[in-house]
Each structure stands twice: as structure tokens, then as C-alpha cells.
A protein has these predicted regions:
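Histidine-centered beta-alpha loop that forms part of the nucleotide-sugar donor binding/catalytic region
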Residues: 111-112, 139-141
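Short beta-strand segments
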Residues: 41-43, 108, 137
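Short Gly/Thr/Asp-enriched flexible loops that form oxyanion-binding sites at enzyme active sites
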Residues: 117-129
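The feature marks non-catalytic terminal segments
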Residues: 1-5, 71, 106, 134, ...
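Active-site rim/loop-helix segments in enzyme catalytic domains that contact anionic ligands
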Residues: 1-103, 128-132, 187, 205-208, ...
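Proline-aspartate-enriched helix->loop->beta-strand connector
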Residues: 93-114, 119
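Residue-level signal for the nucleotide or nucleotide-sugar donor/cofactor binding architecture
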Residues: 17, 117, 158
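Active-site environment of divalent metal-dependent phosphoester hydrolases
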Residues: 22, 48-50, 82, 114-119, ...
Length: 216
């Protein structure tokens, strides 16, 4: 008996605060779905206060290329890092315009369990801007507190490898524990175990919109 719930979106948006957030939270899923659906990846800040982070935007583009996302589908905004709470209205208007232009059927963004001020602001404004749209939350290990995935999506070994390769493009962060490939793989294995699958990407459900379809 098939116990999987199938879901699909013709247009799927991934929205993160900073370069690397989307890949950490959903890189394997992106690799899995990008051949089959239109994916848009939006990072709201290219403005990194730390001068040691001057290369992260270029690393982000290379990372997305590894995942198979076309360059024209990778958007990087200009909001100032660590100042998102002070730009809520501007972020909301930016996201509303994004919704009008792209009209995603599913949106992935930061989990509500994320305690980074920029990440939390993005989540709140995504929920306001994309009313009537399914929204799922991804985990960024370094800044989450109490995240537990209740929506698990099976991915393959190939997807896992692509996620690891994508994160390896961030030479800026190669010594950071949250970029350790063993931790990344272990997280995918753990989420897979929760789903009784070899690997899974894990999310929490911020909003689910659906129609129950009966098979004939």
C-alpha cells in the first residue's frame, strides 16, 4: 500500500533572508524538484555587514547552479542584514509584488522556530504576503530553537550529494560546524528515519491549503 502523500506545485518559491539559508534548509529538495517544476529562489539580503563575507553572493550563485536552478530564477535583494525588523513594510511590499509576478503554488521559508531576527521577520511577512498559499518552514541549524519537522519529503542519494556539493561552494563558511557535510548528511538521514525512508528533507507546516481528491 502506498503511504505517501503526493503533492506538486507548478511554481514553487524558496525565500530566505541571507545567502546560504535556502540551500541549508532545502537544498536536497530543490535538487529533487527543479527538473520537474518552475523554481524561484529569493534571498532578501546581499548586504553583509561583515567584510569577511564579501564573496557569499557569488558563492550563492555557484551553489544554486550546482542544484540546477537557472541563474534567472535566482534573485538577491538589497535589504540590510540584521535590520529586517526595521524594514517590515518594505519587505512585505517586496513579497507582495513577488507573489503577483510569480504566483507560486507553494512557498518554502524559515521555520517559526528560528530565533534570528531577520529570519523571523521573513517568516512573518511571507505569511502575510502569500495568504491563501501553502507555506512550509525550513530549518537553518545555527539559528533554530526547538525545530521539529512534521512535513517530511523523501529525497534520493543523488539529491543529498547535490546538496553537499552546493554547500561546498561556500568557501567562506567551510570551517563552520553547520557546513560540516557529516552534519548535513546526518540531518537528512534523521529526517529520513522519521519518515521511514533513507533520506528526507524536513519542514514544519506554517500553512497548508488543499483539496481532498478521491480516486475513482
Amino acid at each position: 500500500m502506498n503511504r505517501d502523500m503526493s503533492f506538486f506545485g507548478r511554481r514553487v518559491a524558496f525565500i530566505g533572508a541571507h545567502p546560504d539559508d535556502i540551500e541549508i534548509g532545502a537544498g536536497a529538495l530543490i535538487a529533487h524538484i527543479v527538473p520537474h517544476t518552475e523554481v524561484l529562489c529569493v534571498t532578501l539580503s546581499d548586504n553583509q555587514k561583515n567584510p569577511d563575507l564579501k564573496n557569499v553572493v557569488h558563492e550563492h550563485y555557484r551553489s544554486m547552479e550546482v542544484l540546477g536552478v537557472p541563474r534567472q530564477q535566482v534573485v538577491v535583494g538589497t535589504f540590510e542584514t540584521r535590520r529586517f525588523p526595521h524594514a517590515r513594510q518594505e519587505i512585505l511590499e517586496y513579497l507582495i509584488q513577488l507573489n503577483r509576478e510569480f504566483m507560486p503554488e507553494i512557498v518554502f521559508t524559515h521555520t517559526r522556530a528560528d530565533i534570528h531576527q531577520d529570519h523571523a521577520t521573513v517568516t512573518e511577512e511571507v505569511l502575510r504576503a502569500f495568504r491563501g498559499t501553502t507555506v512550509l518552514g525550513f530549518d537553518v541549524l545555527r539559528s533554530s530553537y526547538g525545530f521539529f519537522p512534521n512535513f517530511l519529503v523523501e529525497v534520493t542519494e543523488e539529491d543529498v550529494q547535490k546538496k553537499l556539493q552546493a554547500l561546498a561552494q561556500y568557501k567562506t563558511y567551510e570551517t563552520k560546524y553547520y557546513f560540516n557535510p557529516d552534519i548535513t548528511r546526518s540531518t537528512l538521514i534523521r529526517h529520513g528515519a522519521l519518515a521511514e525512508r533513507p533520506y528526507a528533507e524536513g519542514f514544519d507546516t506554517l500553512r497548508i491549503i488543499g483539496v481532498f481528491a478521491c480516486s475513482s
